[in-house]
């Protein structure tokens, strides 16, 4: 059994991460899950949420936006629409997005076509703010 997981995280635009890590945690469609070396193979969808990995005793946090997570032979492949490291998130921009989404939702009912879109924008903004709060930047 390997002592590390090889993780590749990519978006349609670029490779965000290619590291050997001790463990990784993400938010799947059925809830949060963690993977350690030696985990059984599986494939799941991801929802808007936080992805955290541990490397050398330190935790790193990213905000991710929908995608897929696959484990096979101690290799983890994460394909997501977007991913931002905690220290790359513009907190003011996330707060502004939250305000816009909240304002838009006030004028909509759940039956409106754009309700789900605005609800997702709200969720993305909240996750980005949560993850930004875990940044190691000074």
Swiss-Prot record:
| GO CC, one annotated term | proton-transporting ATP synthase complex
Q: Which InterPro entries did the record assign?
A: ATP_synth_F1_dsu/esu, ATP_synth_F1_dsu/esu_N, ATP_synth_F1_esu_C, ATPsynth_dsu/esu_N
Q: Where in the cell is it found?
A: Cell inner membrane
Entry annotated with the keyword RNA-binding: no
Keyword Ion transport in the entry? The reply is yes
Its placement in the membrane is given as: Peripheral membrane protein
Query: Where primarily located?
Result: membrane
- GO MF: ATP binding; proton-transporting ATP synthase activity, rotational mechanism
Which keywords has UniProt assigned to this entry?
A: ATP synthesis, Cell inner membrane, Cell membrane, CF(1), Hydrogen ion transport, Ion transport, Membrane, Transport
User: What subunit structure does UniProt give?
Assistant: F-type ATPases have 2 components, CF(1) - the catalytic core - and CF(0) - the membrane proton channel. CF(1) has five subunits: alpha(3), beta(3), gamma(1), delta(1), epsilon(1). CF(0) has three main subunits: a, b and c.
The record's family statement is: Belongs to the ATPase epsilon chain family.
Q: What does this protein do?
A: Produces ATP from ADP in the presence of a proton gradient across the membrane.
List the protein's name: ATP synthase epsilon chain
The source organism is Geobacter metallireducens (strain ATCC 53774 / DSM 7210 / GS-15)
The record's gene field reads: atpC
